[in-house]
Amino acid sequence: MSDILDYPDVSSPAAAPDLADLGGEPARARPSSHLQRLESESIHILREVAAEFRKPVMLYSIGKDSSVLLHLAMKAFAPGKPPFPLLHVDTTWKFREMIAFRDQRIRELGLDLLVHVNPDGVAQRVGPFSHGSARHTDVMKTQALRQALDAHGFDAAIGGARRDEEKSRAKERIFSHRSAAHRWDPKNQRPELWSLYNTMLAPGESMRVFPLSNWTELDIWDYILIERIPIVPLYFAAERPVVERDGALILVDDERMPLRPGEVPQWRSVRFRTLGCYPLTGAVPSTATTLPAIVQEMMASRSSEREGRVIDRDSTASMERKKAEGYF
């Protein structure tokens, strides 16, 4: 029996849009029954959030999972627009192509986007090189997210995290309760039976909601291929200037990156499996320039998509600690 329940009453009323060409390959005719169940479950969750919470928001980090989540939200509420704004927590160190893609997609879809930068972090000039990855992530991501949620009074934040990404996310509920201080207690999670979710909140508390919890990385790529979802070009292989640093291929994205003695950027064919702040995100050698090629590459891969994330190397259980402090 499948772990994913069928949601026959929440299918999308709109067909996938005919979007721009993504690598010169035709889209498949229909998704598999497995992907259809995942899609229906995610749409059901998105509609549940809209119905149950006073002021929800969708986190938009510009990556592949956010792109799928945004596509699902557009389907869930078609022909109207999603009844909640998008929020991007900008660390000021994102890849330039990510910001350009973000602005383009928001214009195309005509959505409301809130962008928040931690003003204290900017004043202190906190960055990954000057303060280290742990401090940078805490100030410019975790603290910034808490600031934005408090400033706007959001009681539910929708995100694109998946359980297969990392072990702390594997044990987190789809509707993940947060205290008034935005803290997550992994020992105090609510049961989720079938498609029944406990959305009750005490004053000051909030919920993080993960509609893609049951998706895998391969599911994401297969769905992007079938639905022809636009994604940041960084996911496709291309010749890019990188330096090999601490076991990771780091893209020299702008003049703020200081080169170590002896480092010389090399042009290599690379792409990214995951996207974050460019000094903290390693590329992978690849020749996959189309979506079908990426799917084939994923099917043969035996490594984690987060192997290039420098922040995951801070310490043992670093992700769980970050989440307990309010990280998404």
From Swiss-Prot:
Residues 15-34, 304-328 are annotated as: Disordered. InterPro entries: PAPS_reduct_dom, Rossmann-like_a/b/a_fold, SO4_adenylTrfase_ssu, Sulfate_adenylyltrnsfr_sub2. It catalyses: sulfate + ATP + H(+) = adenosine 5'-phosphosulfate + diphosphate. GO terms for biological process: hydrogen sulfide biosynthetic process; sulfate assimilation. Pathway: Sulfur metabolism; hydrogen sulfide biosynthesis; sulfite from sulfate: step 1/3. Keywords: ATP-binding, Nucleotide-binding, Nucleotidyltransferase, Transferase. It comes from the Bacteria. The keyword Nucleotide-binding applies. Its EC number is 2.7.7.4. It is an enzyme of class 2 (transferase). One of its GO terms (molecular function) is ATP binding. Heterodimer composed of CysD, the smaller subunit, and CysN. Belongs to the PAPS reductase family. CysD subfamily. With CysN forms the ATP sulfurylase (ATPS) that catalyzes the adenylation of sulfate producing adenosine 5'-phosphosulfate (APS) and diphosphate, the first enzymatic step in sulfur assimilation pathway. APS synthesis involves the formation of a high-energy phosphoric-sulfuric acid anhydride bond driven by GTP hydrolysis by CysN coupled to ATP hydrolysis by CysD. This is Sulfate adenylyltransferase subunit 2. The lineage of its organism: Bacteria, Pseudomonadati, Pseudomonadota, Alphaproteobacteria, Hyphomicrobiales.
